[in-house]
Amino acid sequence: MHPDVKKRTLVWALAAAALVAAICAALVLTAGSWLSPIAKREILEALKRQYRGDVEIRSLDITFTPHPHATGEGLVFRAKDRAGAPPLFTLRRFEADAGWMGLLLSPHRISFLRLDGLEIHVARGAQQSPQAGAAGKPPAPSLVFEEVVADGTRLEILPLDASKLPLQFDIYKLSLTSPGAERPMHYRAQLRNAKPPGIIDANGDFGPWNALDPGQTGVTGKYLFSNADLSVFKGISGRLSSQGEFHGQLGKIEVNGETDTPDFEVSVGGHLMHLRTTFSATVDGTNGDTLLHPVNAQFGHTKVVAQGKIIGAQSGGHGVPGKTILLDASVQDGDVADILRMGVKSEPPPMNGRIRFHAKIRIPPGAGDIPDRLELNGQFEIAGGRFTNAKLEHTLSTISARTQGQTDGPTDNAAASDFQGNFVLRNGLMTLSGFSFHIPGATVRLDGAYGLKTEQLNFRGTVTTEVRLSQMTTGLKSKLLRMVDPIFSRHGTGAVIPIHIGGTRSSPTIGLDIKL
């Protein structure tokens, strides 16, 4: 070929290439004007298909240089099968980046997504349509988000019962990465806990998203909660740490964990104790309750086993809004001194011995101290019980000696041994009924009350003795008492004598209502 021809051919080729490049550049630079409406429509349709609902958006801007990029504000998504329910999610602002190849793939791949002000409202399936329920497997996703950052997210799981409080999770930091379509996303999250205040670190897997019933979306993970200040709950204090793992669905999560509080204190008792617990719980989104099954707690030489639930109620009627704790607790072989340290300031505690008890526990919501709101109803048995107050012990020893016909004074071993009774705690007042204990020569039965804060004692009852009144003294008094022996003797007993216990915890008074 002639050199001039080659030269003209090269010029034309370069010119054509330049023209094509110019056209492509013009198309890219002006893509926003003709591709944006198509892209907007495609994005909204993909969201509708993936999450099965209606999408509203206040603004959406898309650019294509140097790569596809979208920003939007005011996104609201409403599930079709949740008439009357809050939007499935609302979003204040978002930014998304994608590659050209990612957009051409099916499902479309979004390489990075930042979400600001995300609120998710997961309603359980009460209002799910028959068609949705019959669909079975959720539809395949139209979009895959490879990396998501959604700091400041709030997740709210709505119970079926509108009178119950929803479960709320305020997620301070949240990042997710996806390995591919129809596979769980891995997440790292920090949740800001309100009470007790602190940050919960969690990581695990989330999804795939269940568009038919979002509450059935799977979630697994581990958590760590450190240095939580319990003093925000009036009446108790200490620094709590907890760790554990969880699995299930958004609507029903199983949690297994443990807590450690080395400096736990109840204000009315004023004693520091090391409190450890292990627990298994179900966070039930269908009713907003947390089921505890069981909780094992240990402090000192005492182990407590409890099970129950934490329920929440909205404001309205005569109730107080908030969470109520309901527990069924028992101790099989505990140290009575450990129990008393919870509510009595003295050291040593008023009694030593081994205790067995069972109690119903209720802590309603409210602004008062926990010891004032705490409600107990149960029964107890104490084996080998012995009072530590020398004055009280001496008085009981004197009564024991008299009831055995020993008129020369008390012996050294006349201590109380076995106790049992029923107790009710309400408004800081411990009421005992059917309270009885044995001392050598007699059985004491009492009913009365003890104020946790006032420390006032007010008990009345009887002492049933093995010997008659006349045998508890000597001389002329003994002869005179023989005339009234039949009055005080009942059902074959020696005598039934009225008794009272009063005063305060630090200075108790005890005595018979007749003078021998």
Predicted features and spans:
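Terminal hydrophobic membrane-targeting helix
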Residues: 24-124
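N-terminal Sec-pathway targeting helices
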Residues: 3-21
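Short acidic, Gly/Pro-enriched loop/turn segments at secondary-structure junctions
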Residues: 102-106, 121-131, 156-165, 388-392, ...
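Coil-to-alpha-helix initiation sites in intrinsically disordered, low-complexity, charged segments
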Residues: 8-9, 99, 474-479
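Small-residue helix/turn framework positions
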Residues: 67-86, 111-112, 116-121, 147-149, ...
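Intrinsic-disorder/low-complexity linker and hinge segments
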Residues: 129-141
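Gram-negative outer-membrane assembly/targeting C-terminal domains
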Residues: 506-516
